[in-house]
Amino acid sequence: MARVRGPRLPGCLALAALFSLVHSQHVFLAHQQASSLLQRARRANKGFLEEVRKGNLERECLEEPCSREEAFEALESLSATDAFWAKYTACESARNPREKLNECLEGNCAEGVGMNYRGNVSVTRSGIECQLWRSRYPHKPEINSTTHPGADLRENFCRNPDGSITGPWCYTTSPTLRREECSVPVCGQDRVTVEVIPRSGGSTTSQSPLLETCVPDRGREYRGRLAVTTSGSRCLAWSSEQAKALSKDQDFNPAVPLAENFCRNPDGDEEGAWCYVADQPGDFEYCDLNYCEEPVDGDLGDRLGEDPDPDAAIEGRTSEDHFQPFFNEKTFGAGEADCGLRPLFEKKQVQDQTEKELFESYIEGRIVEGQDAEVGLSPWQVMLFRKSPQELLCGASLISDRWVLTAAHCLLYPPWDKNFTVDDLLVRIGKHSRTRYERKVEKISMLDKIYIHPRYNWKENLDRDIALLKLKRPIELSDYIHPVCLPDKQTAAKLLHAGFKGRVTGWGNRRETWTTSVAEVQPSVLQVVNLPLVERPVCKASTRIRITDNMFCAGYKPGEGKRGDACEGDSGGPFVMKSPYNNRWYQMGIVSWGEGCDRDGKYGFYTHVFRLKKWIQKVIDRLGS
């Protein structure tokens, strides 16, 4: 059949050509007539069939106006079309002349309200550093790359995705100011969108310089005459009957002179000097002294980032290390003597699936990703639960049958409208499943009191991000409910070395997400990940936020080839390490904050529990009965 049709084609074409020649004078207009009827600006093709070429954006949209569909035909990419169309529509008033359109599309200046702006200004008009668009700290942004895919919400550059009449803006890194406009150049004019108005005090995230004089050793040797606390309360005289009663049975250093009512640090509190005060819930408050910067890893003989002392190196062996209870059982409750020894593991001399990795890290082991936890792996894990709407709020940890430890920002953080009371919350203990009620295993308890550290700094950097929760009544311990130990100075000195690994557990999201439905990233059961401690200089260099002695960071460095991190929902949960000397688990940190989840060059930051242990003891001693 093909052989029959082939030879006929030339004949057909010849007949058609002849027909056109005979009748053309009746069908076609002369060139001059046609030009007079069709007055249309003509575009010269630069090549064969130029209009159907991929990526011909120049012809379709720049030489004359185009539709979104035409832009998509040229770009053949939805994301690229979104990005181009956002700028193109923002530049509608600058279509002519062509040079003005080019300047607008380049985006280094603001046209109109500045929705076209794509420059690199990342500081607000008052000098505050902009928050990363992908970050939820310090503010939870309702505008992000998912809600506004064409707005070029990269890094922390000023943008105007919502068409604000004041021009490009950003969320700020100051928890006290949610968003502020930026000062960017206006296209074709010698002015900026808004004038610069410097704030008194400058950026909230800058590293504050040390004063020339500072108080060393956390005020242990302080002999000054300050007698007023951070809240302005006047100190009680140490010789007063009330102060004597409160000092009874306290482990004070007899070498510290308790003169008059001056601030002192007789118990070696890592928070510094303090005094008793009248009519306060805890009967004591800290004093506002300028302490010298002395990282805890330094005064513990543990300089994160340096090799541990070879004489103290752990070669996979364990030795008996006598455990000394720290708290008064009358106020603390039961469980400390047996803390950190899991009923389904240490008490049965059974290892869990990944604890070997922790021991290997003490002699240079590997990092693994997060995975489902074994049942009973973290019997101190607590779920902080909101009553209405019913939802997982945060993680927490059981430290006795009466007390729970969590992060302060889980309870009080005004930028996220958090200010919870005991009536808003309950705790669920002994859980493994995230959503299912585990009958005969989990216990649900109401709260009696919430105690947030008095110097918790939500306004700047979440310093002292710690809170104590007192249960309504003691919880019954079991194979699935068991307290974790809090570290003493010796344990912290032995375990807090860069590269040594700890463990984070929680029901938080398995990856960062902006979608309204997060079911696909929520785990069904408790997750566990082992993470290495990171050198303090690396922690500080990874963020613009001011890092204090009350924090440490952990996670992976770029290029190490492994991933994992705490994420949203894990906050308040424990960072624990297992001592190879006595086989007990110690809570070294509390999941506090991070910039995104599992991002290269970014680390998770944790509240340093040992640094704040004296505060924990004082609250429990005063208020635990």
Curated annotation (Swiss-Prot):
Molecular function as annotated in GO: calcium ion binding; fibrinogen binding; serine-type endopeptidase activity
PROSITE patterns, sorted: GLA_1 (PS00011), GLA_2 (PS50998), KRINGLE_1 (PS00021), KRINGLE_2 (PS50070), TRYPSIN_DOM (PS50240), TRYPSIN_HIS (PS00134), TRYPSIN_SER (PS00135)
Signal sequence coordinates: 1-24
UniProt propeptide residues: 25-43
Residues in Peptidase S1 domain copies: 367-621
SMART domains for the chain: GLA, KR, Tryp_SPc
Regulation acting on activity, per entry: Activity is promoted in the presence of negatively charged surfaces, such as polyphosphate and dextran sulfate. Inhibited by SERPINA5.
Tissue: Expressed by the liver and secreted in plasma.
Positions where 4-carboxyglutamate occurs in the chain: 50-51, 58, 60, 63-64, 69-70, 73, 76
Domain Gla: 44-90
Catalysed reactions listed for this entry: Selective cleavage of Arg-|-Gly bonds in fibrinogen to form fibrin and release fibrinopeptides A and B
Keyword vocabulary terms for this entry: Acute phase, Blood coagulation, Calcium, Cleavage on pair of basic residues, Disulfide bond, Gamma-carboxyglutamic acid, Glycoprotein, Hemostasis, Hydrolase, Kringle, Protease, Repeat, Secreted, Serine protease, Signal, Zymogen
Domain Kringle: residue ranges: 109-187, 214-292
GO biological process: acute-phase response; platelet activation; positive regulation of blood coagulation; protein polymerization; proteolysis
Function per UniProt: Thrombin, which cleaves bonds after Arg and Lys, converts fibrinogen to fibrin and activates factors V, VII, VIII, XIII, and, in complex with thrombomodulin, protein C. Functions in blood homeostasis, inflammation and wound healing. Activates coagulation factor XI (F11); activation is promoted by the contact with negatively charged surfaces. Triggers the production of pro-inflammatory cytokines, such as MCP-1/CCL2 and IL8/CXCL8, in endothelial cells.
Quaternary data: Heterodimer (named alpha-thrombin) of a light and a heavy chain; disulfide-linked. Forms a heterodimer with SERPINA5. In plasma, interacts (via N-terminus) with alpha-1-microglobulin; this interaction does not prevent the activation of prothrombin to thrombin.
The name this protein goes by in its record: Prothrombin
Species whose genome carries this gene: Bos taurus (Bovine)
Lineage: Eukaryota, Metazoa, Chordata, Craniata, Vertebrata
